Amino acid sequence: MHIRFALALFFSLASTSVASTAAPLAASSDATYGALQTLASEITFTWAKMHPLDATSLGLSDEDGKLETPSLAANARDLAAIVGWERELAAIPLSDATLVDRDDARLLHAELVQYERGLTQTKRFEKDPAAPGRDVTDAIFVQFQQLPIVGRDGATAADAALAWRKIVSRLAAAPGYIKAAEALVTHPGHLYGVVGSQSLAGVPDFLGGALTDAAKTQVSPEMFAAFVDARDATIAAIAHEKREIDAHVASWPENYVMGRAAYDAMLRDEQLLPFTSVDVERMAHDELAHGWAVQSWVEDRALAAKTPIGPLSGGGLAPGGPALIAYYRDRIAQLTSFVATQSVVDVPAWLGNVDVVETPKFQQPTSPGASMRSPLLFSKNSTGYYFITPPASLEEAAKRLDANEDFDRDRILSTGAHEAMPGHFMQGSIARRHPDFVRKTQDSGVFAEGWAFYGEELFVQLGLYGGDLDARYYTAQWERVRGARAIVDPELASGAMNYDVAVTFFEKQTGFTHAASQAAVAGIALYPGYVISYTVGRYQLEALLADYRERMGAAATLHDFHTRLLSYGTTPFAIVGPELLADLGRPLADVRASANY
């Protein structure tokens, strides 16, 4: 599944001989390195202090009981801080800096550009009427997942009580936060409203269900009474938010289009991509065509073998009901063993565990398939959460070969390789340990999704599925999905394609149900620039692999390449590529140690 058209190589660096005694690329200990690290830390922790919901997503639990008060004045404060950080960054001397220091400066600049454009150009806070209630609920859900379990990892009863007090405190402040944030929604968008209303409809299921059930057994009667009061007030505020959306959404215009020039600027300045939207669409069309071709080959083989595509050629139907969660855990264990026995990449002994859970209803409208929440950046908790939405009927999902509902062993293995081992869970767990603060805090979707997508076909080639055909078919299905996404994304963002046309195109090219296609296209429209990460990231990774093999010659191995690749953080390939190639003179153990991997 290689991309087969010529684009200029995105690496530009002096040739480095593998046999040379190249100096390590570990960041220098001079004033430049120190200044960059200090600035990165200041940006991260100051922003988290100003935005407690962001702090929670990072695992900075000291802010878990707090909420900001959204306002235009707060936005002006944020913008002033960003401009100040940009001045500080520009003042750091780079003329004699190491490659790592220069790259860290590029990464910080890209981060600040993204922050600034969010306030001055994108202005999502003006468009999304459901964001206030949804964002609070998302944060409470993260806190719920991170609740200390007394006796585990040294957690005490006092730790658990404190965590619950923070949940109650945040819930109590939520109605005020929601009201203040709603006042900033001066240009609500139709699609934002439609999708947002669907998300808000699922909030009571979580707040009044799983969260309340946990509170009943874990807090004192006095705290439970306070919890119920705060919960009910939050549910009422969110219900009011939903009613307002439902009453007016039909009259709101579509306002998710950003324009092609702005989209290309995002790729260049924020994602550090050497491609325009036109380049991305060419890649995507190639990927889509290749997915259809592979599917045709597999169908032909199945016809000749008189073996139907599906569970009979995919390791058997997965069990339904409560047994499904345990089945997923067994498949992740199988993947972990396969990665080790096939020497795919170094699996660190310190790696945490994956907990398989059902996707909350309030997240399902924009996340109908599987997803992974890797361990939070600064949390002591090393558990990753693998979200699945169990099919209403595995048998019915199998009949329609539903790409979003993993119904047999091999499909669960394929998705598990992407989401967990060696995909997002393992890669994210390694990245958060990086000693360079700039690298530790990187969150490049292009790198993360490129690595996970690359692994899907890799496992087919390495023989994980033996002679079974369904995994090959499924891999081709998802190559089509990634290609279709990367076509729809720039077309929607530029305004060249409207929502209805995009849904029709997407449904035809992916085989998704109409409802799943609507959800997928809505997510693409409202979060431009993300879904191209799979296509572009895999392309850049494979191009880097080709350069690595050329440099290393007979000494090249996939194990060495993969382990080196995961030693630079969740960082754009424009940064990782040159650094990895320049580091080839260093022993693998040295590179891995420099990343605290």
Question: What residues fall within each predicted segment?
Answer:
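N-terminal maturation segment of proteins
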Residues: 23-597
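Bacterial N-terminal signal peptides
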Residues: 6-17
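Positively charged n-region of N-terminal signal peptides that target proteins for export
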Residues: 1-4
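Low-complexity, intrinsically disordered segments with a bias for serine/threonine
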Residues: 16-24
